[in-house]
Amino acid sequence: MTTQLNINSVIENAKRVITPLSPISIFAARNPWEGLEADTFEDVAKWLRDVRDVDIFPNKALIESAVARGELDESVFNQLVTDMLLEHHYNIPQHYINLYIDNIKTLKDVPASYMNHSNVDVVADLLLEKSKRDMADSYHHYDVRPMSDAIIDEQGEPLSEQVNRQMIKWTKLYIDQFLSSWTMPKREQSFYHAWLHLAQHDHSFTKAQRQVIKGLPNDPKMTIESVLTHFSIDQEDYQAYVEGHLLALPGWAGMLYYRSQQHHFEQHLLTDYLAIRLVVEQLLVGDEFKSVTKDCESRSENWFKQTVASWCYYSDMPSDVLLQHDVNEIQTFIHFAATMNKNVFKNLWLIAWEMTYESQLKQKIKAGHESVAGALDVNQVNVSENDNANQPHSVLLNDTQAVDENNSELNQVGTSTKAQIAFCIDVRSEPFRRHIEAAGPFETIGIAGFFGLPIQKDAVDEQFKHDSLPVMVPPAYRIKEFADRYDMNVYRQQQQTMSSMFYTFKLMKNNVMPSLLLPELSGPFLSLSTIVNSIMPRKSRASLQKITQKWLKKPETKLTIDREFDRTSDLPVGFTEQEQIDFALQALKLMDLTEAFAPFVVLAGHASHSHNNPHHASLECGACGGASSGFNAKLLAMICNRPNVRQGLKQSGVYIPETTVFAAAEHHTSTDTLAWVYVPDTLSSIALDAYESLNDAMPMISEHANRERLDKLPTIGRVNHPVEEAQRFASDWSEVRPEWGLAKNASFIIGRRQLTKGIDLEGRTFLHNYDWRKDKDGKLLNTIISGPALVAQWINLQYYASTVAPHFYGSGNKATQTVTSGVGVMQGNASDLMYGLSWQSVMAADRTMYHSPIRLLVVVQAPDYVVARLLANNDHFARKVSNHWLRLMSVNEEGRFKSWI
């Protein structure tokens, strides 16, 4: 029992190196390093470099591109280098230091000839004998790698590649429940037991190996313990060894991790996976593991050689000259080279890049207003801070920080404002919002696209239920869509007719004999479809939509807003009246819309339309778990129009005028259009006027927004008809880049719209409304940071990882991807499950960067004491800041910016 508990603990702790990966159809951005954020970004970068040879700093080409484009100010980098050198004193001639710095900061690689020089070996051996305890012991942990990594097979590749191929084969077989007609036998028992049943008949193993498989324990934990003992792995190194195996195929392991969280009967799936993988490794390695050295001396010797070669190359000191110095001097030189290694300078380049962006953003905000203080209207608020308010965790609050309830600016909307449109914080909404505000008397608002509703949606036109909220939060309610019974019966019949046709096609395709006949039957139709879709993508797509709308028209639907009893549902269906009031109040507070209502309030979710795109969900709403957010917008709009809800809101201090009407729409990000999802049958006269005004302005808004967006796509130049061109991109099934998605995202601004209104933020900024004056206890800010800001950081780091290490964290070239097992994409038929973004999503061309890989900058518009309180109360966020997983800046009531580092 003790051993099994230990193995459980090892696996639980080792999971930190991977992230749960949802199927590609419900793709949701994930931070690949979320489990590692207890360590600093720099330490994780060093660790990944050592254990997997993965570099998560921007490389030389990316840095040079950023400098050439003006995104990275070299003077900022040079100042960082100067500051770093001033912090230390080295007893080394200054000209050697200068030469070393001038050379290494270019990020040039050390030529192989330096590593192979005999004098370098002599110096390395000398240092190893004298000081290996002082300088190399820290590298011992990184030697705990899978045995198969250290053994080279007859083809000259690590034996771990054979292990990977075996695991890809078996994992695909287990996961595939939808594409194949015959699923893995005995999979209902467990992955491990199904593998035991089949592997003993697998002739890719020798007869002796199959006999070993027959004798394996039925308990996967016992199997893991047995293999680790067989390899003589120390118990203190169990976790590091298991982590190495999880990192070997982080995509497939991440998919199993996700499934283990979703289904109780698969909760031990990672344990099964590791047991199988370790057995396969043991079978393939055989007795060769005895030749693998257990100590770190060979790694340490190689490290010394690399460091000596680096010193000689970057300082321009020949190795024979180095040998002329005494041992203590040599040790000083090498210690300097070890301290000032290339990763240190890569990190400084990254920081300089981020500081340059931060400076440019501040200048944009300052240039957009005569002063930030004027935009904040500080004279309207009576603020009193403790003398130590600027010091984190030393804050006193008093009631004088409350908002003056009689403030005319806060309680009255501008007389000319006709509509207020609340958009998702998605960076793609920023240009669209800017063009809407420029087109007429319209105000825009930023809020997370799930609108604060923790729901699972059950839509009539979707096959499966979907959690329509951020992936880190479980749904608390289920909302069903329903229609008139007669209309629903007709629609279901139409659905069944369509699905039966597709099911028949799939059945023939996936079975041996019928698949031989399928080309003859479907060839003419599919050939015609291919030609039409290739030559006239926009027209063919429009025609298909017309046919679909005619033959499979979704009926007018309603939502189960009120609580219903449903014994078949594991979640409450609908809300109680008080819950409706509470969720409406919370959403309005998060939008900073508790007064000054316009006649027409639009809640706009967003969706993306593309054709033949396995990654379409990555372009949908991240706050809704990789789906469109129109459903949530419709639900909240319907709730806010209810008289009993408005009465409850009034009792809570939020008065919505009777003439104000809420509606719902979807912002289609691939075409920059606004599609109505829900408009009440009856509108007040002023709401109707606002609705018509917005509709009249929308064609011009779409044209301007599309022109701005299309100009950034690399494959087209200036276009005369941007709306039609955008529709063509969204309809073209050969288009690998229908839109840029969230590429170039860089910042998250939490504050009043006046701070950024009219400023071109280039579609790089998540914008969330917030007024610190209405948030006395800081709960609203904490909610924004814990939800939307966290989602934004995950998105940011997924784009970052896919750019700096595309081979490990990206998903390769879209044109050569293979959709596998209905869950993700591979390159070829035996690769890891590629869970990041494709090359075309982050690069404009093979050697031309588009996305700028910098960590998210969170900007909070509030006094210092508010931010300090946030850091004191939210340890999770404070750790992200202190460990450099994101950057934090604030702008206070006097217009002063402050970086919290």
From Swiss-Prot:
Protein name (database record): Probable inorganic carbon transporter subunit DabA
Major localisation: membrane
Keywords, sorted A to Z: Cell membrane, Membrane, Metal-binding, Transport, Zinc
GO cellular component: plasma membrane
Pfam families xrefs: DabA (PF10070)
Organism: Staphylococcus aureus (strain MSSA476)
The keyword Metal-binding appears for this protein: yes
UniProt-listed HAMAP family: DabA (MF_01871)
PANTHER family, per database record: INORGANIC CARBON TRANSPORTER SUBUNIT DABA-RELATED (PTHR38344:SF1), UPF0753 PROTEIN AQ_863 (PTHR38344)
Annotated localization: Cell membrane
Role played: Part of an energy-coupled inorganic carbon pump.
UniProt subunit comment: Forms a complex with DabB.
Membrane topology: Peripheral membrane protein
UniProt GO MF annotations: zinc ion binding
Cofactor(s) listed in the protein's UniProt record: Zn(2+)
Residue sites binding Zn(2+) per the record: C424, D426, H606, C621
Family (UniProt): Belongs to the inorganic carbon transporter (TC 9.A.2) DabA family.
Matches recorded under InterPro entries: DabA (IPR018752)
Protein's UniProt keywords contain Endoplasmic reticulum: no
